[in-house]
C-alpha cells in the first residue's frame, strides 16, 4: 500500500531547465500553467525529450487527453478537477494518472476517478502580515 514513498513531485509553470537539472531521478516533473489558456504542444514535446534524456518522468496537469496524445509518462488531476472524462480514454499500461486531495471528500472523488496515486495536499492559512 505504501510503496515508493520516496517519489518527489516538482511542479513547474514554465520550461526552465536550470531547476530541472537540480532534481534527482526519483522526481516527477509536473507541468501546470494555469495563467495561459493556450497550450504549446511543441514546447511540451521538447521538454518531454529533455526530461527523458535526464531520466525524469514528465506529467501534464489537468489535461489527460493531451498527455496521452503526446505520449507523456502520465497526467496529474488537481483537487479542483472533479470530472470523469478521462475514464473514456485508452492509454498505455505504463501511463499513470495521479491526483491530489485536501480532505476525505476529495479523496473519495479521486478514488472514483480511478487515479493510480493520490497525494495529500495540505491547506495553508493565508499570512495576514
List the predicted regions and their residue ranges:
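Active-site/ligand-binding-proximal alpha/beta "capping" segment
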Residues: 111-129
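Conserved N-terminal beta1-alpha1 strand-loop-helix module at the mouth
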Residues: 1-84, 89-116
